[in-house]
């Protein structure tokens, strides 16, 4: 169906980057503000680990919100990138359980921070069963969204397509999102990595 462009609500033009958080996430917000950014991406915990037990202390939340306000950056202009080790597409039951638990914890931390969303890499279907990999990612997302209440979204990031990684095509990303229960879909979406898009062809 044709949509008249004049009836669309313009989206805010946000410019940001993944910002280094040495000194804590409040410092990431200050660095972003000092660079003139209007958005930023951060890690809520060390990205090389699962961080299934890591939480966010109330004083850290308060300091982060104050730094965002000082920088003139809205909480809704902040994305958290999940840890790199998560593989929600894996057929290995033990590894999947750990990844799904870590994704839920990531959503919990990000909801506590009151940011817009959590962007994560779906992982790899190491058994070469791409459809099953898509289903496993959707199951992990469903668990996280059912466990954690709030407005923070889970965003599937497209992959560069190396090996058996899931999310190299629009169809795979859409397959994940449409596999979610309809009641949860408003809290899910995708993060478009243009470098990954180019690399995947």
What is each residue range found by the language model?
Residues 18-22, 45-47, 83-85, 123-125, ...:
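Active-site beta-loop-alpha junctions enriched in small/polar residues
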Residues 2-80, 86-108:
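N-terminal pre-domain/capping segments
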Residues 88-190:
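Active-site acidic/histidine proton-transfer and metal-coordination neighborhood
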């Amino acid at each position: 169906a044709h949509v008249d462009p004049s009836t669309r609500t313009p989206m805010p033009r946000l410019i940001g980057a993944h910002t280094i958080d040495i000194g804590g996430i409040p410092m990431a917000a200050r660095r972003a503000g000092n660079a003139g950014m209007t958005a930023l991406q951060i890690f809520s915990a060390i990205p090389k680990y699962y961080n299934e037990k890591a939480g966010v202390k109330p004083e850290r939340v308060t300091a982060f919100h104050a730094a965002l306000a000082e920088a003139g950056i809205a909480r809704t202009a902040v994305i958290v990138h999940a840890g790199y080790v998560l593989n929600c597409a894996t057929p290995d039951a033990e590894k999947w359980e750990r990844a799904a638990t870590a994704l839920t914890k990531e959503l919990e931390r990000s909801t506590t921070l009151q940011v817009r969303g959590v962007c994560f890499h779906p992982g790899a279907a190491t058994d070469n069963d791409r459809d099953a990999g898509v289903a496993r990612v959707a199951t992990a997302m469903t668990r996280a969204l059912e466990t954690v209440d709030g407005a923070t979204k889970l965003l599937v990031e497209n992959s560069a397509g190396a090996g058996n990684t899931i999310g190299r095509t629009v169809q795979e990303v859409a397959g994940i999102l449409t596999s979610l229960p309809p009641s949860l879909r408003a809290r899910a979406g995708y993060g478009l990595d243009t470098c990954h898009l180019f690399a995947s062809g």
